[in-house]
Amino acid sequence: MTNRWQRTDMPRGEEYDSRWHTLAEAGENIHGEADLVESLLAESGCTNVLDAGCGTGRVAIELAKRGVGVTGVDADAGMLGTARIKAPEIDWYEADLSDPTGIPNGTFDLILLAGNVMIFLEPGTEDRVLANMASRLTEGGLLVAGFSLRPGQLTCDRYDELTAAAGLAQVARWATWDRIPYTGGDYAVTVVCR
């Protein structure tokens, strides 16, 4: 398994954003992640979010528009550059998610790993990333991750093992960001709690 994000053919910055603009112009809801996060925050009384692997800031910016306190972190300087241009009022940090010193100090009520972050990680760092995320959650805080399930990539069973090892307990698993029950398939959204 190789680090998919390091491939040179991966769209970055504005090119990455153009896909989302096209979908929005076609009438698609491109804010499913923000919709779910907003509802989870309302249900739990949580207030602050870390968008880990935030890319160009699509989800973080939408959450901020909805009044959510949000911080973004990503390892890709180009993607963050686009995010900073679009929303300079949000705190954006360049950091490797497996490095505990790279993420801003403090804890978060909810940490989001959207956009297939888990399958774009450097292979073999998933355990460190999840342990790092767990250490940044408030007691009772939620970690929400959505990623594709394809042969040769991270499975739900392996993800469950890794989150349990990080001291996190599963709360829910859905097939989509709009809470359609997971019954198998090629995508899962999993919520775990500290």
Functional labels for PLM-detected ranges:
Residues M1-G53:
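Conserved class I S-adenosyl-L-methionine
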Residues G140-F147:
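Conserved beta-strand signature within the Rossmann-like core of class I S-adenosyl-L-methionine
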Residues T155, L168-R194:
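Class I S-adenosyl-L-methionine
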Residues D109-G124:
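A short SAM/SAH-binding and catalytic strip from SAM-dependent methyltransferases
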Residues R58-P100:
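Class I SAM-dependent methyltransferase SAM/SAH-binding core
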Residues G102-L110:
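A short acidic, Gly/Pro-enriched loop at the edge of an enzyme's catalytic core
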Residues D127-E139:
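A short glycine-rich, Lys/Arg-flanked "PGG" loop and its adjoining helix->strand segment in the class I
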